[in-house]
Amino acid sequence: MSMKQRVIIVGGGPVGLLTALGLAKAGTNVVVLEAESQPSDSPRALVYHFPVLPHLKRLGVLDDCVAAGLMRQNFAWRVHSTSEMIFWDLSCLEGDVELPYALHLGQDKLSRILIEHLKALPNVEVRYSSPVVDCEVGPRSVRVVLGGESPGVIVEGDWLIGADGANSFVRREVLNQNFFGITWPQRYVATNTRFDFDKLGFGKTTMQVDDVYGSVICNIDADSLWRVTFMEDPNLPMEGIRGRIDQVFKELLPTNDPYEVVAFSPYRMHQRVTDRMRNGRVILIGDAAHVTNPTGGLGLTGGMFDAFALTSVLNQVIHDGRSEDILDVFEADRRRKFIELVSPRASDNLRNLYHQKPGEGKNDWVNNTRSISKDIDRMRDALRFPETMETFL
C-alpha cells in the first residue's frame, strides 16, 4: 500500500521541513534526519518573495509566519554616495498576483513554525542530533546509518532526499557528484543589528549601492532588529571582525545614533550546481543541489521552489501511480532554472550592489533603476522575476 512508503529526508532546514510537510499532508510517511541538535539561529536568509506565499498558505503555515515576521510591499535602492533612495513597490502587482507582498522572517523562526505543524501529523518524525554516516541504495529502497547520539541506528525507506546544505553528505558520499562553480573572492559579514532605520526613511529592504560600503539592510522584526550585510577583504583576520563592524557602521549608517550588534556571521558566497539532482531513488534539493549568493533573496526562494515542485510530483508517483520519469523532468527543469535564471540574476545583483565603480556605467545603472520606479509597467515586469523561478509539473 502507498501509505507504507517512507521518504527519508536528510537535512532539517526550511527546505527539508517544507518538503516533509508537503509530503506528510498528502499521506506520505516521512522521517527527517538533522545532524544539528536544533535549528540554527545564526544570521541567515530571511526574505521570501511573493510567489512563495501561496504555497505557505496552502500548507497552512502562512498565518503563523506572518504573525512571527512582517510583510512589506516596497523596497529601496540607496545610492550611498548621494543618499538617493529609489523605491520599487509590489503594490503595482495588486490584481495580478494573489499576495503582492514579501515576507520577512528569520530562517530559524520559519523552521520552528514548520516543526510545530509537523508535530501535529502522525506520519512524520523529525530527529535532531542524527547525522547520516553511511548509506546503501538499492533499486527500490534506501538504507541509512546514523551517527551522533544514535550511533549505528539504521533507517530504511523507499526514497532519499538530500536537503542537507552546501556541504551535502548525500551529494558527496551517496551520489558522488561534482559541485562545480565559483567562490566569490570577498568575505561577507551578516549582522543582526538593533537600530531604527525606519526613522531615517529606509525601506524594509534597502539595497545600498557602493563599491566600498555596499550593503543589504533588511528589517527582521517589529522590535527594530535589522539584518545588515556588508563586504570586506578576506585577508583580514577573522578575530577582528567585531571591531571592524563598528568601523564600517560609522560610514554605512547616515547618523551617529547608537546601535546594538546582537549577532554576526562571516561567510563566503558561491555560485555552484551539482551535475545531477537525481539518480534513481535519491534526489537533491536546495543548497545540496545548487548554491547562489543571497543578494536579492533568490537562494532560499529557489530551494523552496525545489521543495514545492518535488512534493507535488513525488506524491503523484507514490499515491497516483505516475511514472517516475517525471522526476527526471523535475531535475532537468530545476537545474536549468538555476543555471539560466537564478545564478545569473543573483550574480548581477551582487555586482551591481557591491562592485560598481563610480563613473558612467554606474550612472547609467542608477538612471535606469530610477526610471523603472516611475514606469509602472516596467516596474511590474522587473518585480515579477521570482515567478520565473518556479516549476509546474
Swiss-Prot record:
Pathway: Alkaloid degradation; nicotine degradation. FAD binds at residues 6-35, 277-287. It catalyses: 4-(6-hydroxypyridin-3-yl)-4-oxobutanoate + 2 NADH + O2 + 2 H(+) = 2,5-dihydroxypyridine + succinate semialdehyde + 2 NAD(+) + H2O. Optimum pH is 8. At pH below 7.0 or above 9.0, there is substantial loss of activity. Its EC number is 1.14.13.163. One of its GO terms (molecular function) is FAD binding. It comes from the Bacteria. One of its GO terms (biological process) is alkaloid metabolic process. Inhibited by Cu(2+) and Zn(2+). The keyword Flavoprotein applies. Disruption phenotype: Cells lacking this gene are not able to grow in nicotine medium. It holds the Pfam family FAD_binding_3. The catalytic efficiency of HspB is higher than that of HspA. This is 6-hydroxy-3-succinoylpyridine 3-monooxygenase HspB. It comes from Pseudomonas putida (strain DSM 28022 / S16). The gene is hspB.
